[in-house]
A protein has these predicted regions:
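Charged, low-complexity intrinsically disordered terminal segments
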Residues: 1-98, 102-317
Length: 317
């Protein structure tokens, strides 16, 4: 999808790691910018501390513009954690969106961040997240989501946050290294396109396999006030509630962290709608990367079963 881009790439991520897959994708984006594609990258600050050199270098390219969402006032070492403790209410509000939009015509949205553990390159862990590749009117919603966060008062130009641009020699080495890594193809499961023409050809093949159906994107806009919790229910929560209340045959849930309140479980429960089947797939204790989140789910597991919800837990292998 990067190689197929002709005009623009807008990418928004919670995590973009400075590892093999992160640098590979950064290199592909850099090569797109080299041929004139306008690139905007919006990254959450919480995981951006260790990748300053990579993105400070990319930000020097005339066709690449990078913003950081909700940055800490003190951005290095212990100072970052001091900021977290002193300004917890604001710093705890993170941007978990993962959106990738090309030319305003095709987009990818889902749960996958950019890092080796999300693409099967990490030997110790593998996060099996899902993405959806879409085109058509629903991509307008993806673009609107990106634009809302990009123009948010909480999105700061990366150039305002990094102390200085890399030295010329260091910058040249980093940029050339990224261009070379983009060609190297780090043990990919399939061969990647080698240019824009082949990229568009591969994308056309993917489009021929797509499911044609009505689609709607629901996203929560960036908050106006970071310092106080909102009393207004989020768009996504309301949309899920409407779907659950109107379901007549089946509800399928897949979530890494399945933590629901009692009233949400009652709304999902099939005991009052015998014809409704509800099934949920989540992590087991062995496959979960956050024990605290599993504990929050496990305490409600007996009640979920009482409500007629079938639960499936992912094995660690």
């Amino acid at each position: 999808i990067v190689d197929a881009a002709e005009h623009s790439i807008d990418a928004q991520y919670y995590i973009w790691s400075d590892d093999r897959s992160g640098r590979y994708l950064a290199g592909r984006i850099l090569r797109a910018a080299d041929r004139g594609v306008q690139v905007r990258l919006l990254l959450d600050d919480f995981n951006a501390e260790g990748i300053g050199e990579l993105f400070a270098s990319l930000d020097t390219h005339p066709n690449i513009h990078i913003r950081i969402f909700n940055p800490a006032r003190n951005r290095s070492g212990w100072g970052r954690w001091v900021s977290f403790l002193m300004d917890f209410q604001r710093i705890n509000r993170r941007m978990h969106n993962k959106t990738f939009v090309v030319d305003g015509a095709a987009g990818i949205v889902g749960g996958r961040n950019i890092g080796d553990e999300y693409f099967g390159f990490d030997q110790s862990r593998y996060f099996r997240d899902r993405d959806v590749l879409a085109l058509g009117p629903v991509v307008e919603g993806m673009a609107d989501n990106f634009q809302a966060y990009w123009n948010s008062r909480w999105a700061y130009p990366a150039s305002d946050l990094y102390a200085s641009a890399p030295a010329d020699t260091e910058l040249a080495e980093t940029m050339e290294g990224l261009r070379q890594q983009a060609v190297a193809q780090p043990r990919l499961p399939v061969s990647a396109p080698t240019g824009a023409e082949q990229g568009r050809s591969e994308l056309a093949k993917a489009f021929n396999r797509m499911t044609i159906a009505p689609g709607e994107l629901v996203f929560d806009p960036p908050p106006e006030n970071m310092d106080a919790p909102s009393e207004t229910p989020k768009r996504s929560a309301l949309a899920l509630q409407r779907l659950a209340q109107t379901a007549t045959r089946e509800i399928l849930i897949e979530s890494a962290y399945l933590i629901l309140a009692r009233e949400q479980l009652q709304a999902l429960g099939a005991t009052e709608r015998p014809q409704l089947e509800v099934a949920a797939l989540t992590n087991s204790l062995a496959s979960n990367d956050l024990v605290t989140n599993h504990a929050g789910y496990a305490r409600w597991r007996p009640y979920m079963l009482e409500q007629g919800i079938d639960i499936y837990e992912l094995k660690p292998d």
